[in-house]
Amino acid sequence: MKFKKSEPKIQCINKLDNFNRFLNTGQKEFCDFLKKLLNLEQIRIQVCELKELKKWLNVNRIEEIMDVPGRNDEICVVSQIKVKDELIAYFPYVLKGRNVKIYLNINSFISKLAEAISDRITLCYLQDFKGGDWIFGENLARIIVANCISTKKYDGIKFAHLIEKMEQLASSTFEGEFFPTGVIVCSDSTKYKNNYFEFLTPRNIDTLDKREWFLANGRETFFLLDSNTNSNGIYRKSILNTSDYIGRFFDDYYLTNDLKTPDFIVRTVGPNEISVSDSDGKEFVKVENVWRYRHHKNITRFMVEQLGISYKTSYAILFYILRCSRNHISSILWIPDDCSEKAINSLTTNNRVKIWNSDLDIMNESHQVLIDKILASDGAIVIGKNGKIIFESVFADMSNNSSSVVKLAESGETAAKLLAQNGIAIKISQDGTIKIFSGNEKIYY
């Protein structure tokens, strides 16, 4: 639903009949979903008169995305209830969180999100604001992903069916083992005529059996689907010839050199985990039934700004974070801001492990096999700002746990939060969840 700039029929959404029903049965689902999806601190629905909203935002007219004056961590997004091209009411809400202002400059993403929410709040309105708990749950997630992942608008119902199918595959096994698989949803399959293996008989996602799904691993090979979820064959991605193994990893995963706009990838990554991504690195992942939006540029920029490291180092760190997550390895990576022996010793116990005469380096591909093994071992790996490993394993000193440090559910999270008093600590759980700690802040990736 495109944003309509005109005076709404109702000046305050709260004056609509039964809107309180949404506040009671749909508001929590709506706010919780957006908070988790965008990794935000808070979502607030701005229930006020239109003139009050304009005064608060210091604007003469309402736009889809607006800055909140005097707040460095808030923006206001406006969806709308529109029926038969008649604007009934604006639905404004505030997004609060770190770096949320970035969406003011890349507003196409938030615009598409706002459009998807407009569709859902209008549906809720047409049902007398009943059913908000399911309208703004998993259904909203699938509509938003379908809306935001591509410049082309896809059929939300067919896309939701594709997601449901991939979720089923993510929880199934072939010959007793979980297996990855994937598809490229494409507007024109002739764009992939090189390295394309055509079926004798066209398939549909509902007629493909498990043995056939096993043929495309979602890494090198992908089913090509049209907008009706039909497939005529499998595409084999091109082989990159580059010595930059970190860059190769990201280019391979997002098919940077193969995927054509407005096409996108849907794949299973591991047990109960799916991913929807484009060639730019925009990605929606569902891990443990929670949808999250992420972009590798955002998290690498965060590390660069917090630690003063190079982007090359930040991408190498992210490389190992993602390897642990996708291989379901529980681990902690710690990058101290102050890498002095005194600073590290102050937060760790005496049983620090240093194995080699020369330091391992996360930027060196030949060291990868050893680093992978170390990450799967007990304790936290300590990485310097230059990418060299300072200690293969350390343990957070819980005896000095101050009252200001919140006790967390898992000892690994507690350790990561303690270590993050100096720099950044990343906790990867066995279920694939990634949590990044910096000071008192926790960010999901």
Task: Walk through the language-model features, giving the residues of each.
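Divalent-cation
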Residues: 2-445
